[in-house]
Amino acid sequence: MKKLFSKYTFPILAACSMSLFTACDKDFAEINTNPNAVSVPTTAYIFSKALYDGAANSGNKGSLLFGLMQYTTSYNDVEGFGSKYTASQVNATGGVFTNSYPTQINEIGEVIKAVKDDPTKVNQYAMARIWRVYCFSRLTDLYGDIPYSEAGQGYNLSIFQPKYDAQSAIYADMLKELEASATALTTSNTSTFGNSDLIYQGNVTKWKKFAYSLMLRLGMRLTKVDAASAQSWVTKAIAGGVIRDYADIAKMSYTSGGQNINKNPIAWQLLNDNYLRADGINNTEGGKYQDVFINSLKANNDPRLGVLSVVYVNGTASSDESIQKGMPATINGTKPADFVTFSEPKQTTVLKVDAPLLLFTVAESNFLLAEAALRGWYSAETASSLYETGIRAAMQQWDLISGTTGTIAQARIDSYVAAHALKTSSSVAVQTEQIYNQVWVGLFPDAQEVYNNYRRTGYPALTPNVYPGNATGGKIFRRFLYPVLEQTLNRASYNEAVQRQGTDDLLTKVWWDK
């Protein structure tokens, strides 16, 4: 065969050369065109993919942030990195960065490029810009300075080593983008993504509320670093109208069948990491709820305990609140003999793959508004009433996740609210702590947003785990590390970011955390 190839290659190539402009180019374009490829992309489909990927990469931090916020832990040092800060696993924090740019950031950028100059698609343009802010906000909040203004421009502008923008500049632009997009959205124009919009199915009014709700979230993020700007943006968001009704909750819907991209990303990752066997024993990575979380729920007689957790008794899941028990994060590498007795996420709620992923809720709006009221930035309602509404909303939203009505009995909600009233006669600090203790439970399983608020407010006042061989000296880390490859492939930009922001270290604070 080798001899035959050698024998006939030259004559064939020579013949082709002699007839270069005749026979050999006949049907060349047709032969080299993939009949299954799309020459003109369908923008609506790319938008759907950007939504899926943005939601998935926001949710897929699994054991890392779940462990860091002391919801879960593992006896396995690798899986338990988030709760143990084990030095050998620190580079795992670069995964969100690595996964974000080629997917959601690139995809939403292509959507914006396709619609921005078309005056008939003003709503599509605004919605895409809002989603781009959502994606970038989740990314910069984890890393600080990141590629932003030049991100996703490799194909369009041949920018293969994008600069890292300062987080202060990123925040300024994101807030400007939200304001411009919310203003541009109009019911007089019918250009939406329709059913390809997996969040609101093209509802312009709801997208506007989502934009102002994100403005409220990001504006409040500035309280430590620039209180005046924080107040200005929070006030503007409230005036624009934020999410206050269940029908307006920003959520991604999923199914139990089909491809994995169609499944709730938090539930799907938790299941695959640990809980597919559903017997309390054969947990692949050794994961269970952490004792800090379960002990808090039990101590506060929180009716969510039986909604979120189960203990397997003789192979059967039990939600009996009296037997729920969290596993200590200090267990050192060996599976405990009583492993089966520890609580783990419930299959019909937290692990429900066709449950919606809640991106911005009524509960979050009310908790943020309660803080704004405490600061004197909002006076139409009291901090106490907003705080109470936030608690009720956080409990009632489990109806959306479970797919049932009355998941938590109204009487138990009333009893809990009465027992945890805001201490209005105490200091602002005491009341703020109460609010963000409720955020810790009420926004679960959105561990990243809880982590963001923990860094900003210091609440809940979690006690770090001083574990042998940890990477932080027994401190809860303040940011994620850039991927190692950035030091090789984008060294100049990486070095500039590190010089400006500080050492690429887990304890270096991002701009708004300083």
What residue ranges belong to the model's regions?
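Amphipathic alpha-helical surface "interface" segments used
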Residues: 72, 194-206, 316-317, 323-330, ...
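C-terminal functional modules
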Residues: 395-514
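Structured, solvent-exposed acidic/aromatic patches
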Residues: 40-42, 75-131, 135-402, 425-432, ...
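Beta-strand acidic-aromatic groove motif in beta-rich domains, primarily in extracellular
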Residues: 59-68, 144-146, 230, 449-452
